[in-house]
Amino acid sequence: MRILFILDSVENPTSANVLMAQRLAGVLCAAGHAVHLLELWDGLHPQPELPGCTVHCLAFADERLMNAALENGRSGGSPIPVRLARLCCHPTAVAAAFRQLVLHAPRRVLDTRRELEKLDAAFHFEVICAVCAPYRAAFALETAQVQAKKAIWQLDPYASNRDYQAPGGYPRELELLNHLAAAFITRQAVGDYAPGAPLAAAAEKVHVLDFPSLVPPAAVPNHAADSKKRCVFCGSLYPGLREPGFALELFRALGLASGWTLTMAGGGWQYFAADAAQTKAVLGEQFEQPGPVPAETARTMQAQADVLLNLGNAVDNQLPSKLFDYFAAGKPVLHLCVIENDPALPYLARYPLALVLHQGQADAADILHCWLGEVCGKQLPFGEVCDLFPELVPQAVAAEFVRWLM
């Protein structure tokens, strides 16, 4: 099968969605499929090469500058006049903002559509699949004049995404689905397609596709037995969705005497600077913030950790794929839950080295202190993890993807 995936890392160069798609593409390529990638990138952070796949690139440095100046339109942050002043420093960003906010015709959609039509004419793809979110690629594919089957892989929802207000909501998403042959969704999104639900009319087009997360952990030397004990988080922080406050509170309560170093890699700290400063004042060098790191660096950090930290989402219809990367590492997983119906809980119940703590739990710090002493140094063999979660093995995910598109 000749397949083209559209990957969008303009907003987030270390996007977990892009990583998931790259893993699926690699497995499909190894299975004998002809796989191409159209990478929409920010002009500053190229994606790593994927052996065997043919890569085509479109750079959108203008939209990167626009997003940085306008702070991605998030509430709070800098006053609007300050954002506009920053925007005016970059003529290409001003043009990008005009196209997006006034003309409602983002260059990313228009240029991607033209590139899709050109590539389809040249390579005669059987399937073109846009990986979402972001959804710019999906909207480009929606009206592209191509012969290939059109599909999207919704690793994050559109209308039901509670992190932002999606333009057009459910009617716009249904319109998009009407132009597609198939849509792959997460298990958490199934309810949107149930009888009487907003997207029920498209139910026959959607198929659940699990995260292709279980890859062997990075081969790294273990740190010395007398070196610091590490609890590691790798991921982005978002106000109202995934916040670090509960984790920082717990490790401040453990204090320096615990001997544990909390390392939290990833972006979003500008929204939580005060909490981070308070934690740094208590823990000093035992609180590390290396910032965003490439996927391979994150895998190395996870392989060298003693415990992996997962921050539960504040919504019940999105599940961070990084949880399954943690499982693949085989390390003990500390999950901090902030809602009762956390979609991660059923998976954590299947993982024998997991501890779940709930926000507001009075004895959480004491429980954590005891658990850290019990699990430090433990690790599940990779094969055992695959037996626990066979649906997350990339080859199984690839087989499902192909089965629904044949």
Placement of each model-derived feature along the sequence:
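N-terminal subdomain of nucleotide-sugar transferases
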Residues: 1-65, 182, 214, 252-254
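Membrane-proximal helix-turn-helix segments that form the acceptor-binding/catalytic region
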Residues: 23, 107, 117, 136, ...
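A conserved catalytic-core segment of Leloir-type glycosyltransferases
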Residues: 43-107
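Short N-terminal targeting/anchoring amphipathic segment
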Residues: 116-137, 151
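A short, active-site helix/loop in glycosyltransferases that binds the activated sugar's phosphate group
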Residues: 178-206
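Conserved donor-binding/catalytic core segment of Leloir-type glycosyltransferases
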Residues: 223-242
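Nucleotide-activated donor-binding/catalytic signature segment of Leloir-type glycosyltransferases, i.e.
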Residues: 266, 273-297
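Catalytic binding pocket for nucleotide-activated donors in carbohydrate/polymer assembly enzymes
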Residues: 303, 307-389
